[in-house]
Curated annotation (Swiss-Prot):
Residues annotated to bind substrate: E235, R266, Y404
A biological process term (GO) from this entry: glycine decarboxylation via glycine cleavage system
Keywords attached to this entry: Aminotransferase, Mitochondrion, Transferase, Transit peptide
Localization per Swiss-Prot or TrEMBL: Mitochondrion
Catalysed conversion reaction: N(6)-[(R)-S(8)-aminomethyldihydrolipoyl]-L-lysyl-[protein] + (6S)-5,6,7,8-tetrahydrofolate = N(6)-[(R)-dihydrolipoyl]-L-lysyl-[protein] + (6R)-5,10-methylene-5,6,7,8-tetrahydrofolate + NH4(+)
Annotated protein name in UniProt: Aminomethyltransferase, mitochondrial
Membership in a protein family: Belongs to the GcvT family.
Organism superkingdom: Eukaryota
Length: 408
């Protein structure tokens, strides 16, 4: 969402705190309450003080009783439980499923071991990003994906269009959209010890990016050790009829240390981790190379291509892109999406795509794009906010060190 969820959260919180009508706020934020979809945890959120706002066609909690800053810090120190059921999980199956998906994404899907996954990007014919997605190889003929809520319709239409053409040529592939499941994200240092209380599976042997189908709290779940915060954690796909029960069990086992957390803190956490938000930092005119996601292009894919827009992307890989995604630390007010970036001579060199105040660093941080050659850490820039220049410096990302659970 343009401008960042943290900023949206602050704006909506102020409106509600000042006596703003919830329906009026909903209308201003793109949809009426009656038009919004609700996850199975909607009543659970409301009962726990969730401030519900429109997001990607859903009514979602932007925050709870804690401030966005306090929620961010608690995730880093203890843990957070997020309802991310608005995102779309789907399974692709068939003996030709790997070759099919490799036409649409940049990952080396064939090289993935069973039960492992990776971040990838769906690209268009011009090499731009249709969406980013976490893809997991369950088996050679079963892939599991999660795509962004705001991109669901276009992603599914894109996949379906290419699937029809692929099947018309004799390819064996089918799909199932997991609308019968809910998705919870458990993040933070207490995520693993708390979840361990609810499963017999030894989670110490499940590493970052790995996937299992297992029993959690009496329900068959899809468990991926991943997340969107930079912390260790899990995404749990649970049958929707057991979603509330699982959320309650996780909170109970944490003895109050893991807290329900909304989209506002989730955005500040991902910003501190230097991760892209589709619609801000990644869009249809931005390539994976420009976005700093070169690492996501498998070695074999760099040699063979074969995905949409490969000619553009591989040329950028060889020659270098004209713009690059970078991080910034700045003075003055927090940078906003679309804030102009200038060099020290006052020349336009780029634009901020995400920005805000870092609760952990107690500094303003931002992500944006600048001209190649001006992307190196330590480069001094000016960020224009409300017509005034503010000092900034290009900074390596992540801003806050990540704590992914990997083999030692």
């Amino acid at each position: 969402m343009r401008g960042g969820l943290w900023q949206l959260g602050q704006s909506i919180t102020r409106r509600l705190a000042n006596g703003g009508d919830k329906k009026a706020v909903a209308r201003r934020c793109f949809a009426t309450e009656s038009e919004l979809k609700k996850t199975v945890l909607y009543d659970f959120h409301v009962a726990h003080g969730g401030k519900m706002v429109p997001f990607a066609g859903w009514s979602m909690p932007i925050q709870y009783k804690d401030s966005i800053m306090d929620s961010t810090l608690n995730c880093r120190q203890n843990g957070s439980l997020f309802d991310v059921s608005h995102m779309c999980g789907l399974s692709l199956k068939g003996k030709d499923v790997v070759s099919f998906l490799e036409k649409l994404v940049i990952a080396d899907v064939a090289a993935l071991a069973h039960g492992t996954g990776t971040l990838t990007v769906f690209t268009n014919e011009k090499g731009g990003a249709i969406d980013d997605s976490v893809i997991t190889k369950v088996t050679d003929d079963h892939l599991y994906l999660v795509v962004n809520a705001g991109c669901r319709d276009k992603d599914l239409a894109h996949i379906e269009e290419h699937m029809k053409a692929f099947k018309a040529k004799g390819g064996d592939v089918s799909w199932h959209i997991h609308d019968e499941r809910s998705l919870l994200a458990l993040q933070g240092p207490l995520a693993a010890p708390v979840l361990q209380h609810l499963t017999k599976e030894d989670l110490s042997k499940l590493y970052f990016g790995e996937f299992r189908v297992l029993d959690i709290n009496g329900s068959q779940c899809f468990l991926t050790r991943t997340g969107y915060t930079g912390e260790d954690g899990f995404e749990i796909s649970v049958p929707s009829e057991h979603g509330v029960e699982l959320a309650k069990a996780l909170l109970e086992k944490s003895e109050g240390k893991i807290r329900l957390t909304g989209l506002g803190a989730r955005d500040s956490l991902r910003l501190e981790a230097g991760l892209c938000l589709y619609g801000n930092d990644l869009e249809q005119h931005i390539t994976p190379i420009e976005a700093g996601l070169t690492w996501a292009i498998g070695k074999r894919r760099r040699a063979e291509g074969g995905f949409l827009g490969a000619d553009v992307i591989l040329k950028q890989l060889a020659d270098g892109p004209s713009i690059r995604r970078v991080g910034f630390i700045s003075s003055g007010p927090p940078p906003r999406s679309h804030s102009e970036i200038q060099d020290e001579g006052g020349n336009n060199i780029g634009e901020v795509t995400s920005g805000g105040f870092s609760p952990c660093l107690k500094k303003n941080i931002a992500i944006g794009y600048v001209k190649s050659g001006l992307h190196k850490a330590g480069t001094k820039v000016k960020i224009i906010i409300r017509g005034k220049q503010n000092e900034g410096v290009v900074t390596k990302m992540p801003f806050v060190p990540t704590k992914y659970y990997k083999p030692s």
